[in-house]
């Protein structure tokens, strides 16, 4: 196994661990029961496309220079993980009893200083040191978030 193969295996394992953590552990095992699950608008599709093109270039170079089949297979597996993470997986915001998960980071409700709704359909949540810009797929979800936060506060 070459250094390249080891690097590819490490990236695949990290991507798999993130996918399992994001899909199952955050939703069911961390911080109690999920009260509301809101799908968010996808961002970073161009980044995923650029990464896939770079992987295709690596695959082409590996095939044309008679590289190992294992390296080509690992590049394809990494490409599949990138496709899943960038295009299939739906980002979401999970509301629990004590706080919410946004971007896989838990934020307590007590940290919320202010909330605003912009004209573009963004929910702006001001925390102590930064603001979160949350864009949902359906505008009805903003009302669900609002009612849940009013109920909790």
From Swiss-Prot:
Any one of the GO CC terms: plasma membrane
Record has Cell inner membrane as a keyword: yes
Key word Membrane present: yes
Transmembrane segments: 6-26, 46-66, 68-88
Keywords, alphabetical: Cell inner membrane, Cell membrane, Membrane, Transmembrane, Transmembrane helix
Membrane topology, record value: Multi-pass membrane protein
Family annotation (InterPro entries): DUF986
Compartment list: Cell inner membrane
NCBIfam families per the UniProt record, alphabetical: PRK02913.1
Homology family: Belongs to the UPF0266 family.
Protein's name in the database: UPF0266 membrane protein SG1324
Taxonomic classification: Bacteria, Pseudomonadati, Pseudomonadota, Gammaproteobacteria, Enterobacterales
């Amino acid at each position: 196994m070459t250094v390249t193969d080891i690097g590819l295996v490490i990236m695949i394992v990290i991507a798999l661990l993130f996918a399992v953590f994001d899909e199952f552990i955050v939703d069911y095992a961390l911080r109690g029961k999920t009260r509301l699950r809101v799908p968010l608008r996808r961002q970073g599709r161009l980044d995923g496309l650029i990464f896939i093109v770079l992987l295709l270039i690596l695959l082409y170079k590996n095939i044309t220079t008679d590289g190992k089949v294992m390296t080509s297979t690992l590049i394809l597996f990494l490409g599949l993980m990138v496709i899943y993470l960038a295009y299939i997986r739906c980002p979401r915001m999970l509301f629990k009893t004590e706080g919410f998960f946004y971007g896989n980071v838990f934020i307590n409700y007590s940290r919320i200083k202010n909330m605003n709704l912009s004209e573009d359909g963004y929910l702006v949540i001001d925390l102590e040191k930064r603001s979160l810009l949350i864009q949902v797929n359906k505008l009805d979800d903003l009302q669900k978030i609002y009612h849940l936060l009013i109920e909790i506060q």
